[in-house]
From Swiss-Prot:
The enzyme's E.C. designation: 3.1.-.-
Biological source species: Mycolicibacterium paratuberculosis (strain ATCC BAA-968 / K-10) (Mycobacterium paratuberculosis)
Protein name: Putative pre-16S rRNA nuclease
The keyword Nuclease belongs to this UniProt entry's keyword annotation: yes
GO biological process, one term: rRNA 5'-end processing
The protein's role, per its UniProt record: Could be a nuclease involved in processing of the 5'-end of pre-16S rRNA.
């Protein structure tokens, strides 16, 4: 568990690790629900896919692995909820554990960790601004957070690959 606590977010667009063109799956890990988003094949735009209910039997891992296959994902990006003080809390440990379990199921497809501080808060604000009532937000908030995580990754990836091309 010591190594798990010291894991840091991966770098989008790292030339040594980037799988190239293809769909990416974004995952927002919650204690009850897991939000899932997917990019287009050119990795430009993230859109919501579904919310997967967590289950002690591991059914949620089977569903996530099935989505990777169904959507043809070349990379999976799991949100890493670091604290504002940049520490690894219990939510981050949970996300790392889920990412590790999923990685074992879908190898060789890479599973990355992405800094996701405040994405759920940002998603709630966006939904509120769009006129979605609090009660209705519960059904889509996890997907909206997954979209925010993945879109941030895609934007950073695009900037990093552009810089690498200019170098």
């Amino acid at each position: 568990m010591v190594l798990t606590q010291h894991r840091v977010p991966d770098r989008p667009g790292d030339p040594d690790q980037d799988p190239g063109r293809g769909r990416r799956l974004g995952i927002d890990v919650g204690s009850v629900r897991i939000g899932v988003a997917c990019s287009d094949p050119d990795a430009v735009l993230a859109t919501p896919v579904e919310t997967v209910r967590r289950d002690r039997s591991g059914k949620h891992l089977r569903r996530l692995a099935a989505l990777v296959t169904e959507l043809g994902a070349v990379e999976v990006v799991v949100g890493l909820p670091r604290t504002l003080a940049d520490r690894t809390g219990t939510s981050a440990l949970d996300a790392i554990d889920l990412a590790d379990q999923l990685a074992r199921r879908i190898a060789p497809t890479p599973v990355r960790l992405a800094d996701e501080r405040l994405t759920t808060v940002a998603a709630q604000r966006s939904l509120r601004a769009a006129g979605v009532r609090a009660k209705e937000q519960r059904a889509v908030i996890d997907q909206a957070a997954a979209v925010a995580i993945l879109q941030s990754w895609l934007d950073q990836r695009r900037a990093a690959t552009r810089e690498a091309g200019d170098g």
